[in-house]
Amino acid sequence: MKLTSLRVSLLALGLVTSGFAAAETYTVDRYQDDSEKGSLRWAIEQSNANSAQENQILIQAVGKAPYVIKVDKPLPPIKSSVKIIGTEWDKTGEFIAIDGSNYIKGEGEKACPGANPGQYGTNVRTMTLPGLVLQDVNGVTLKGLDVHRFCIGVLVNRSSNNLIQHNRISNNYGGAGVMITGDDGKGNPTSTTTNNNKVLDNVFIDNGDGLELTRGAAFNLIANNLFTSTKANPEPSQGIEILWGNDNAVVGNKFENYSDGLQINWGKRNYIAYNELTNNSLGFNLTGDGNIFDSNKVHGNRIGIAIRSEKDANARITLTKNQIWDNGKDIKRCEAGGSCVPNQRLGAIVFGVPALEHEGFVGSRGGGVVIEPAKLQKTCTQPNQQNCNAIPNQGIQAPKLTVSKKQLTVEVKGTPNQRYNVEFFGNRNASSSEAEQYLGSIVVVTDHQGLAKANWAPKVSMPSVTANVTDHLGATSELSSAVKMR
């Protein structure tokens, strides 16, 4: 025997005797919910028992569409690296549904209790009654599935490097369609456990929250998904909620028919770009520090971008090159977000919009949630006012525009001897005061009195023009008053 062959044989013998298990493929070709061979429950149990990387669970189309596996009790958590694939999607685009309605009983969101007694539904802390559970596991792929009628469709808890792609996530009325959370089990965030997950090319329909990034979820990518809600949704809250989630990227998604398209609660350094938000009460509903909103299309909402006051007076939110138009619609949808205050100031970018933590919020704060009036936050309305939050983004003032012979003059009033970036926007309607088309930018520097003035000539002719300003720390103002160019 050659020496090389001997070494290979000894290696193979060593792997066998050491208990090494090769990656396996488990085929699901029975839709009964039992532990017999061929069921989904059996396949998950088998994969969990095999410690090898990259097992596969291939779910076959059985019978005629729609293909539905109705589970009668919670499925076991996924504990091994595995690809769970509905095989029909690659062939016909059909999803294979995993449906929890056989054991999750009750009326809408009330069937989904929260972690605290008496609370229920989407807008409370919960990890109750999920469909597929990825807990303390890495390297899981979900594809070609419709995860349907659970309280949480997919729970990704303290897990990293997982991929959720080409699925439909539908009618999950508790926490979210997909919940990505670093929750330690007691409501506390964990900062390094829930990273680098990817949620791509999915359709989210009629979930309470479409997706959540909470309690330490960081460096995750959410891209090219549709988040939509219909009249069938009992609690249309947020397309995405980020709560104490940092450094995530949300790119190229569409959000429609929610209270908020996307809501950030005290998350930091998230990058939100190239999304479209329409027919929401609020397009963006924001707090947090270092978050950047770049080149989004925000139209047909009650308010385009709402920046809330918060206890951190130094928090800064950056808005750049966003296209904002046709807002001011009468959309009063307020499930832990949105805008239902009757006399609320409307527009493209509005500071100081009240949310559920604020005095003056009108709407639901979550099922069974009661906040003592003394604990509600207030937004300062007068200089030197006490016991209230400062105006967002340090109250940075919008620039002032004037026009003469189709040349704009911009005046900025700010901190002395500081750099400011001014962005200009055009509107096709002369009566519009929003930011339909990004036209360009200039940098100005204030003098010792905090004043700067500059001239700028747009290269594109638009009936009306607005501008906003961003300071060197990243805080962006509301829009200026519009000037007519014709």
Swiss-Prot record:
The keyword Repeat appears for this protein: no
Entry GO MF terms: 3-dehydroshikimate dehydratase activity
A Gene Ontology biological process term: 3,4-dihydroxybenzoate biosynthetic process
Membrane spanning stretches: none
InterPro entries according to UniProt: NosD_dom, PbH1, Pectin_lyas_fold, Pectin_lyase_fold/virulence
Catalytic activity reported: 3-dehydroshikimate = 3,4-dihydroxybenzoate + H2O
Enzyme Commission identifier(s): 4.2.1.118
SMART domains recorded: PbH1 (SM00710)
Entry keyword set: Lyase, Quinate metabolism
Pathway: Aromatic compound metabolism; 3,4-dihydroxybenzoate biosynthesis; 3,4-dihydroxybenzoate from 3-dehydroquinate: step 2/2
Purpose: Converts dehydroshikimate to protocatechuate.
Protein name (database record): 3-dehydroshikimate dehydratase
Organism from which the protein derives: Acinetobacter baylyi (strain ATCC 33305 / BD413 / ADP1)
